[in-house]
């Protein structure tokens, strides 16, 4: 377990323990707000915005304050990354694009978003995991921030190589179809995405 990078323990009862060791840096932000506390707080904030996340069961400190452990229930589903690798036809690409759009509409900027962190719970429902690095806006995510955020998961070749079956551009187009703004804004967003994404 590296400092700042959690270790994951999956228990037989399908619950998970996520373990963080405090960074040794004197001025690390984790000293003021430990990652485990951010995880718990973000889970609460995401749930308040009707986003499915794991249910938090417990938060503990071990060895003074140097180690924090969050115990939570595992989401019942499969990551988009695993589905793309094994059953790509099971990925509802249209609903996935709508899901990304809904996060942005709700003012949620999931900085670490990639297809390994998005769980397909059913054909029409998704959930998030590993959301420690999330920023919440009071309104909708601005256009430029949407473009940068949406391009993030498309940088992972292990995912996009599988997504080519359905088409990376198709995923972007499906997202753009949700964007009910002026055509000028739509074109601008598409241009930014094409410059950032490995399409």
Regions found by a protein language model. Give the residues of each.
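A short beta-strand motif that forms the metal-chelation/ATP-contact edge
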Residues: 69-73, 125-131
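Conserved protein kinase catalytic core
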Residues: 24, 79, 136
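Conserved kinase catalytic-core helix
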Residues: 42-52, 81-117, 121
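C-lobe/activation-segment region of protein kinase-like
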Residues: 127-199
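Conserved ATP-binding subdomain of kinase catalytic cores across diverse folds
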Residues: 1-75, 101-106
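Short, solvent-exposed loop/turn segments at secondary-structure boundaries
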Residues: 29-31, 84-88, 140-142
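A cross-family kinase active-site recognition segment
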Residues: 49, 53-67, 108-111, 115-123, ...
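Charged, low-complexity C-terminal accessory regions
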Residues: 99, 103-127, 158-162, 172-180
């Amino acid at each position: 377990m590296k400092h700042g990078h959690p270790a994951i323990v999956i228990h037989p009862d399908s619950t998970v323990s996520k373990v963080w060791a405090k960074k040794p840096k004197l001025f690390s932000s984790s000293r003021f707000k430990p990652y485990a506390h951010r995880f718990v707080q973000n889970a609460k904030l995401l749930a308040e915005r009707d986003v499915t996340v794991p249910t938090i069961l417990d938060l503990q400190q071990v060895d003074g304050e140097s180690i924090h452990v969050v115990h939570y229930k595992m989401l019942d589903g499969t990551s988009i990354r695993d589905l793309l690798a094994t059953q790509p036809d099971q990925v509802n690409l249209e609903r996935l694009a709508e899901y990304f759009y809904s996060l942005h509409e709700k003012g949620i900027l999931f900085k670490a978003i990639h297809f390994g962190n998005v769980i397909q719970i059913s054909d029409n429902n998704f959930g998030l995991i590993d959301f420690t690095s999330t920023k919440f806006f009071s309104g909708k995510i601005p256009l430029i921030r949407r473009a940068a955020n949406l391009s993030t998961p498309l940088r992972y070749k292990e995912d996009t190589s599988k997504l080519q079956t359905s088409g990376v551009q198709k995923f972007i187009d499906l997202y753009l179809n949700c964007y009910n703004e002026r055509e000028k804004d739509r074109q601008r967003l598409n241009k930014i995405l094409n410059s950032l994404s490995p399409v």
